[in-house]
Amino acid sequence: MPTLMYLQEMIRMHAKDKIIVALDVPDLAAGEKLVDRLSPYAGMFKVGLEFFTAAGPAAVRMVKERGGRVFADLKFHDIPNTVAGAARALVRLGVDMLNVHAAGGKAMLQAAAAAVREEAAALNRPAPVIIAVTVLTSLDREALRCEVGIEREVEEQVARWALLAREAGLDGVVASPREIRAIREACGPEFVIVTPGVRPAGSDRGDQRRVMTPAEALREGASYLVIGRPITAAPDPVAAARAIAAEIEMVK
Protein backbone atom coordinates (compact mmCIF):
# COMPACT_ATOMS: atom_id res chain seq x y z
CA MET A 1 0.00 0.00 0.00
CA PRO A 2 1.26 3.56 -0.68
CA THR A 3 2.34 5.45 2.43
CA LEU A 4 0.17 8.19 3.93
CA MET A 5 2.92 10.75 3.27
CA TYR A 6 3.05 9.78 -0.40
CA LEU A 7 -0.72 10.01 -0.81
CA GLN A 8 -0.85 13.39 0.91
CA GLU A 9 1.85 14.74 -1.40
CA MET A 10 0.05 13.47 -4.49
CA ILE A 11 -3.22 15.04 -3.31
CA ARG A 12 -1.45 18.39 -2.93
CA MET A 13 -0.45 18.34 -6.58
CA HIS A 14 -2.87 20.31 -8.68
CA ALA A 15 -5.22 18.03 -10.59
CA LYS A 16 -3.86 19.11 -13.98
CA ASP A 17 -0.34 18.04 -13.00
CA LYS A 18 -1.52 14.45 -12.73
CA ILE A 19 -3.12 14.42 -16.19
CA ILE A 20 -1.12 13.45 -19.28
CA VAL A 21 -3.25 13.95 -22.39
CA ALA A 22 -2.41 11.49 -25.17
CA LEU A 23 -1.96 13.24 -28.52
CA ASP A 24 -2.71 10.20 -30.65
CA VAL A 25 -3.34 12.28 -33.76
CA PRO A 26 -2.38 11.92 -37.44
CA ASP A 27 -0.78 15.31 -38.09
CA LEU A 28 0.65 18.48 -36.58
CA ALA A 29 -2.48 20.57 -37.15
CA ALA A 30 -4.62 18.18 -35.12
CA GLY A 31 -2.05 18.18 -32.34
CA GLU A 32 -1.85 21.96 -32.27
CA LYS A 33 -5.61 22.23 -31.94
CA LEU A 34 -5.72 19.91 -28.95
CA VAL A 35 -2.76 21.50 -27.17
CA ASP A 36 -4.20 24.98 -27.62
CA ARG A 37 -7.54 23.89 -26.15
CA LEU A 38 -6.34 21.57 -23.41
CA SER A 39 -3.20 23.22 -22.02
CA PRO A 40 -5.07 24.66 -19.00
CA TYR A 41 -6.16 21.14 -18.02
CA ALA A 42 -3.10 18.99 -18.76
CA GLY A 43 0.19 18.85 -16.91
CA MET A 44 1.83 17.04 -19.81
CA PHE A 45 1.10 15.86 -23.34
CA LYS A 46 2.01 12.41 -24.61
CA VAL A 47 3.60 12.29 -28.04
CA GLY A 48 3.32 8.68 -29.13
CA LEU A 49 4.25 6.60 -32.13
CA GLU A 50 1.48 7.79 -34.45
CA PHE A 51 2.07 11.50 -33.89
CA PHE A 52 5.87 11.28 -33.81
CA THR A 53 5.96 9.17 -36.98
CA ALA A 54 3.67 11.63 -38.76
CA ALA A 55 5.24 14.89 -37.60
CA GLY A 56 8.68 13.95 -36.29
CA PRO A 57 10.54 16.16 -33.80
CA ALA A 58 8.22 19.02 -34.77
CA ALA A 59 5.55 17.34 -32.63
CA VAL A 60 7.69 17.78 -29.53
CA ARG A 61 8.73 21.31 -30.45
CA MET A 62 5.11 22.34 -31.03
CA VAL A 63 4.12 21.35 -27.49
CA LYS A 64 7.21 22.95 -25.94
CA GLU A 65 6.69 26.20 -27.85
CA ARG A 66 3.23 26.41 -26.29
CA GLY A 67 4.63 26.01 -22.81
CA GLY A 68 3.65 22.36 -22.46
CA ARG A 69 5.58 19.43 -21.06
CA VAL A 70 6.16 16.34 -23.19
CA PHE A 71 6.07 12.63 -22.45
CA ALA A 72 7.76 10.95 -25.43
CA ASP A 73 5.96 7.62 -25.49
CA LEU A 74 8.15 5.90 -28.09
CA LYS A 75 8.82 2.67 -26.16
CA PHE A 76 12.42 2.12 -27.27
CA HIS A 77 13.38 -1.57 -27.45
CA ASP A 78 16.68 -2.36 -29.17
CA ILE A 79 20.30 -3.11 -28.37
CA PRO A 80 21.76 -0.92 -25.58
CA ASN A 81 23.86 1.34 -27.81
CA THR A 82 20.97 2.11 -30.14
CA VAL A 83 18.55 2.86 -27.32
CA ALA A 84 21.13 5.05 -25.57
CA GLY A 85 21.60 7.11 -28.73
CA ALA A 86 17.87 7.52 -29.23
CA ALA A 87 17.43 8.55 -25.60
CA ARG A 88 20.15 11.19 -25.95
CA ALA A 89 18.34 12.60 -28.98
CA LEU A 90 15.13 12.95 -26.98
CA VAL A 91 16.99 14.77 -24.22
CA ARG A 92 18.31 17.23 -26.80
CA LEU A 93 14.73 17.75 -28.02
CA GLY A 94 13.77 18.80 -24.51
CA VAL A 95 11.28 16.08 -23.55
CA ASP A 96 10.26 15.86 -19.91
CA MET A 97 9.60 12.13 -19.78
CA LEU A 98 10.48 9.16 -22.00
CA ASN A 99 10.11 5.41 -21.91
CA VAL A 100 11.83 2.21 -22.93
CA HIS A 101 10.66 -1.42 -22.83
CA ALA A 102 11.56 -3.34 -19.68
CA ALA A 103 11.67 -6.47 -21.85
CA GLY A 104 14.85 -5.09 -23.43
CA GLY A 105 16.79 -6.29 -20.39
CA LYS A 106 18.91 -4.75 -17.67
CA ALA A 107 21.86 -3.73 -19.86
CA MET A 108 19.56 -1.82 -22.20
CA LEU A 109 17.77 -0.14 -19.30
CA GLN A 110 21.04 0.88 -17.66
CA ALA A 111 22.39 2.27 -20.93
CA ALA A 112 19.25 4.34 -21.46
CA ALA A 113 19.25 5.74 -17.92
CA ALA A 114 22.94 6.63 -18.08
CA ALA A 115 22.58 8.27 -21.49
CA VAL A 116 19.66 10.41 -20.35
CA ARG A 117 21.47 11.71 -17.29
CA GLU A 118 24.79 12.25 -19.04
CA GLU A 119 23.19 14.17 -21.90
CA ALA A 120 21.12 16.30 -19.54
CA ALA A 121 24.20 17.12 -17.47
CA ALA A 122 26.14 18.07 -20.61
CA LEU A 123 23.31 20.43 -21.58
CA ASN A 124 23.04 21.78 -18.02
CA ARG A 125 19.34 20.98 -17.76
CA PRO A 126 17.25 18.69 -15.53
CA ALA A 127 17.18 15.10 -16.68
CA PRO A 128 13.85 13.84 -18.02
CA VAL A 129 12.01 11.20 -16.06
CA ILE A 130 12.83 7.82 -17.61
CA ILE A 131 10.40 4.98 -17.14
CA ALA A 132 9.99 1.41 -18.37
CA VAL A 133 7.02 -0.09 -20.17
CA THR A 134 5.88 -3.30 -18.48
CA VAL A 135 2.91 -5.35 -19.77
CA LEU A 136 0.84 -3.44 -22.33
CA THR A 137 -2.63 -2.57 -21.10
CA SER A 138 -4.12 -4.24 -24.19
CA LEU A 139 -2.90 -7.64 -22.94
CA ASP A 140 -4.77 -9.82 -20.49
CA ARG A 141 -3.65 -13.05 -18.80
CA GLU A 142 -4.64 -15.23 -21.75
CA ALA A 143 -2.78 -13.11 -24.30
CA LEU A 144 0.30 -12.87 -22.10
CA ARG A 145 0.45 -16.66 -21.79
CA CYS A 146 -0.69 -17.87 -25.21
CA GLU A 147 0.65 -15.13 -27.50
CA VAL A 148 3.68 -13.69 -25.68
CA GLY A 149 4.75 -16.92 -24.01
CA ILE A 150 5.01 -15.62 -20.44
CA GLU A 151 3.48 -18.03 -17.93
CA ARG A 152 3.41 -15.68 -14.93
CA GLU A 153 0.30 -13.83 -13.86
CA VAL A 154 0.15 -10.27 -15.25
CA GLU A 155 0.62 -8.69 -11.83
CA GLU A 156 3.65 -10.86 -11.06
CA GLN A 157 5.29 -10.08 -14.40
CA VAL A 158 4.67 -6.34 -14.03
CA ALA A 159 6.19 -6.32 -10.54
CA ARG A 160 9.18 -8.30 -11.79
CA TRP A 161 9.85 -5.81 -14.59
CA ALA A 162 9.29 -2.87 -12.24
CA LEU A 163 11.97 -4.20 -9.90
CA LEU A 164 14.31 -4.68 -12.85
CA ALA A 165 13.73 -1.07 -13.91
CA ARG A 166 14.44 0.20 -10.41
CA GLU A 167 17.62 -1.87 -10.16
CA ALA A 168 18.74 -0.47 -13.53
CA GLY A 169 18.37 3.10 -12.27
CA LEU A 170 15.11 4.13 -13.94
CA ASP A 171 12.67 6.46 -12.22
CA GLY A 172 9.54 4.36 -12.65
CA VAL A 173 7.31 2.37 -14.96
CA VAL A 174 4.25 2.47 -17.15
CA ALA A 175 1.65 -0.03 -15.96
CA SER A 176 -2.08 -0.56 -15.87
CA PRO A 177 -3.95 0.60 -12.77
CA ARG A 178 -4.56 -3.01 -11.77
CA GLU A 179 -0.86 -3.46 -10.94
CA ILE A 180 -0.25 -0.21 -9.04
CA ARG A 181 -0.48 -1.78 -5.60
CA ALA A 182 1.93 -4.60 -6.47
CA ILE A 183 4.44 -2.10 -7.87
CA ARG A 184 4.20 0.12 -4.79
CA GLU A 185 4.81 -2.87 -2.53
CA ALA A 186 7.79 -3.98 -4.60
CA CYS A 187 9.41 -0.63 -5.41
CA GLY A 188 8.41 1.81 -2.68
CA PRO A 189 6.57 5.13 -2.38
CA GLU A 190 8.90 7.30 -4.47
CA PHE A 191 8.84 5.14 -7.59
CA VAL A 192 6.98 6.85 -10.45
CA ILE A 193 3.95 5.00 -11.81
CA VAL A 194 2.46 6.31 -15.05
CA THR A 195 -0.93 4.76 -15.62
CA PRO A 196 -2.74 4.36 -18.93
CA GLY A 197 -5.90 2.28 -19.05
CA VAL A 198 -7.79 5.01 -17.20
CA ARG A 199 -11.42 5.47 -18.15
CA PRO A 200 -14.03 7.69 -16.48
CA ALA A 201 -17.05 5.75 -15.23
CA GLY A 202 -19.37 4.83 -18.09
CA SER A 203 -16.89 5.54 -20.90
CA ASP A 204 -15.87 3.12 -23.65
CA ARG A 205 -12.98 0.82 -22.67
CA GLY A 206 -11.71 0.76 -26.28
CA ASP A 207 -8.82 -1.71 -26.64
CA GLN A 208 -7.83 -1.44 -22.97
CA ARG A 209 -8.33 -4.55 -20.85
CA ARG A 210 -7.10 -3.67 -17.35
CA VAL A 211 -8.79 -0.39 -16.47
CA MET A 212 -9.88 1.83 -13.56
CA THR A 213 -11.46 5.25 -13.20
CA PRO A 214 -9.12 8.21 -12.56
CA ALA A 215 -10.14 8.39 -8.89
CA GLU A 216 -9.60 4.67 -8.36
CA ALA A 217 -6.13 4.76 -9.95
CA LEU A 218 -5.02 7.69 -7.82
CA ARG A 219 -6.29 6.06 -4.64
CA GLU A 220 -4.20 3.02 -5.52
CA GLY A 221 -1.13 5.27 -5.75
CA ALA A 222 -0.68 6.26 -9.40
CA SER A 223 1.68 9.20 -9.98
CA TYR A 224 0.30 10.28 -13.37
CA LEU A 225 -2.71 9.31 -15.47
CA VAL A 226 -2.46 8.98 -19.26
CA ILE A 227 -5.85 9.81 -20.75
CA GLY A 228 -6.49 9.92 -24.47
CA ARG A 229 -9.78 9.14 -26.16
CA PRO A 230 -12.04 9.93 -23.17
CA ILE A 231 -10.81 13.52 -23.57
CA THR A 232 -9.62 13.94 -27.15
CA ALA A 233 -12.50 12.03 -28.78
CA ALA A 234 -15.20 13.53 -26.57
CA PRO A 235 -17.81 15.81 -28.19
CA ASP A 236 -16.38 18.58 -26.00
CA PRO A 237 -12.76 17.78 -25.04
CA VAL A 238 -12.51 20.77 -22.71
CA ALA A 239 -15.62 19.74 -20.79
CA ALA A 240 -14.32 16.16 -20.58
CA ALA A 241 -10.96 17.34 -19.24
CA ARG A 242 -12.65 19.59 -16.70
CA ALA A 243 -14.83 16.72 -15.49
CA ILE A 244 -11.81 14.46 -15.03
CA ALA A 245 -9.91 17.21 -13.21
CA ALA A 246 -12.89 17.69 -10.90
CA GLU A 247 -12.95 13.95 -10.17
CA ILE A 248 -9.24 14.04 -9.36
CA GLU A 249 -9.65 17.00 -7.03
CA MET A 250 -12.14 14.96 -4.99
CA VAL A 251 -9.62 12.21 -4.25
CA LYS A 252 -8.68 12.15 -0.59
From Swiss-Prot:
Catalytic activity, EC: 4.1.1.23
- Catalytic residues in the record: 75
Write out the GO cellular component annotations.
cytosol
What pathway, per the record?
Answer: Pyrimidine metabolism; UMP biosynthesis via de novo pathway; UMP from orotate: step 2/2
An example GO BP is:
'de novo' pyrimidine nucleobase biosynthetic process
Any one Gene Ontology molecular-function term assigned to this protein's record: orotidine-5'-phosphate decarboxylase activity
**Keyword annotations for this protein?**
Decarboxylase, Lyase, Pyrimidine biosynthesis
Q: Which family does it belong to?
A: Belongs to the OMP decarboxylase family. Type 1 subfamily.
PANTHER family for this protein: OROTIDINE 5'-PHOSPHATE DECARBOXYLASE
**How does the record describe its quaternary structure?**
Homodimer.
Name-wise, this protein is Orotidine 5'-phosphate decarboxylase
Q: Which species? A: Moorella thermoacetica (strain ATCC 39073 / JCM 9320)
